Design a protein with these regions (language model features):
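A conserved FAD-binding loop/helix module that cradles the flavin
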Residues: 249-270
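Flavin-binding catalytic cores
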Residues: 195-225, 241-244, 265-289
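A conserved beta-strand/loop capping segment in the N-terminal third of enzymes
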Residues: 34-96, 101-103
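Predominantly flavin-linked oxidoreductase catalytic cores and closely associated redox partners
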Residues: 3, 7, 84-220, 232-235, ...
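Catalytic phosphate/metal-binding cores of nucleic-acid and nucleotide-processing enzymes, i.e., regions
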Residues: 1-3, 331
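C-terminal helical "tail/cap" subdomain of flavin- and related membrane-associated enzymes
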Residues: 269-358
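N-terminal FAD cofactor-binding segment of flavoenzymes
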Residues: 3-59, 75, 143, 147
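FAD-binding beta-loop-beta segment adjacent to the flavin cofactor pocket
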Residues: 42, 169-172, 226-245, 255, ...
């Protein structure tokens, strides 16, 4: 909706936005990198062009210009969008539960009431996708603390992208640290595994990391967040007839990283371009080779033939950050991709590729 309303021909359209949640809490944080200022530049609460990477065998400062790593708080996003959308009389909001989506007579059922439309843009993923034998389905799950200290302890000019200096017993696990100021930072514990942990395990690992690697024992937890994102080779449907799937439901979560926000913006821009030209708004996803790259890495992680921390350590040890970030944004060229792939251990990736192909 926000992308549509940037264009006068689409501002005349009537839109109904349906969500079960009132969106009044700071329940999540989005991070991404891009070169240019995007639509949500005004609400990026912090940006960095200096990142840090840590593992047991590598500590490296990453200067990522012309990229900037950006952070958006959920509550800022909700307020910004609500304020902008409420200025348009054709936009209506409805808080309720979507009980059914109809692709024949295009519309939705919300709390027992039917609504019809020219198009339905659906962001609700299927509850029980049917996986093939080759499909990999891992979970990226994370718990984050916004911590505050009385003294200045953080360098707000640099963020930690990945820090693998922690137990890998459950699978690929790392923390990232996003300092908003010298005494306030988001510390997030992230795992790529088939199953979730017990709630207290996330807190225990976060407390250990903060104590051992941030050297902090005196701090306050101002906010906390928890989330789960699928990391999968499963091909989500683009939709049916005039129902267009968007977000994770439309395959906009990158399988190998879990990053979603940036890809949603790219997808939304393509949808708007189709609408402006009078065409059907179902658009192609990224080139198929990127899905293949994701599937190979996920297969490596599933087989545990090469631990995730070794994969990412090798990527950042042997490559400059800019091509790696372009690669992870599905924005790299074939020669760049070939160079990056050549730096990774051949055998585990070859086996995984063969398993995915055959």
């Amino acid at each position: 909706a926000m992308h549509m309303l940037q264009h006068k021909p689409l501002q005349r359209k009537r839109m109904l936005l349906v969500d079960e949640s009132p969106k009044i809490h700071n329940d999540r944080t989005w991070c991404f990198w891009e070169k240019e200022a995007g639509l949500f530049e005004p609400i990026a609460c912090k940006q960095w062009d200096q990142l840090l990477f840590h593992s047991d065998t590598l500590s490296k400062a990453l200067s990522i210009a012309p990229y900037r790593y950006k952070m958006i708080r959920g509550i800022d996003f909700y307020r910004y969008c609500m304020d902008a959308l409420q200025k348009h009389p054709g936009v209506e909001f409805l808080q309720g539960k979507v009980e059914a989506i109809h692709s024949e007579k295009t519309g939705v059922q919300v709390d027992g009431k039917q609504y019809t439309a020219t198009y339905v843009f659906n962001s609700i993923p299927p509850p029980n996708p049917v996986l093939s034998q080759k499909d990999v389905w891992l979970l990226q799950h994370f718990k984050g603390w916004m911590i505050e200290t009385d003294r200045d302890v953080f360098n707000p000019a640099e963020a930690t992208l990945m820090d693998f200096r922690m137990s890998q017993k459950h699978g690929t696990a790392f923390c990232y640290v996003l300092p908003i100021s010298a005494n306030r930072a988001l510390v997030e514990y992230t795992l790529f595994t088939p199953t979730l942990l017990q709630p207290e395990e996330y807190d225990r690992e976060l407390a250990t990391y903060v104590r051992q690697h941030l050297n902090l024992t005196d701090y306050r937890i101002a906010e906390s967040e928890f989330g789960i994102i699928p990391m999968t080779t499963y091909r989500f449907s683009k939709g049916e007839n005039n129902v267009i799937n968007i977000g994770t439901a439309g395959g906009q979560t990158k399988g190998s990283s879990g990053y979603t926000f940036y890809f949603i913006q790219q997808h939304s821009q393509k949808i708007v371009a189709q609408l402006l030209s009078g065409k059907h708004p179902r658009v192609a996803n990224a080139p198929a080779r990127f899905h293949f790259y994701d599937s190979v890495l996920l297969e490596v992680l599933r087989q545990n033939s090469l631990p995730g921390h070794e994969v990412f350590t090798t990527l950042f040890r042997k490559n400059k950050p800019q091509p790696v970030l372009a690669f992870l944004n599905n924005a790299s060229s074939l020669p760049t991709e070939a160079r990056i792939i050549s730096t990774l251990p051949t055998l585990p990736f070859l086996r995984a590729a063969l398993h995915q192909v055959f």
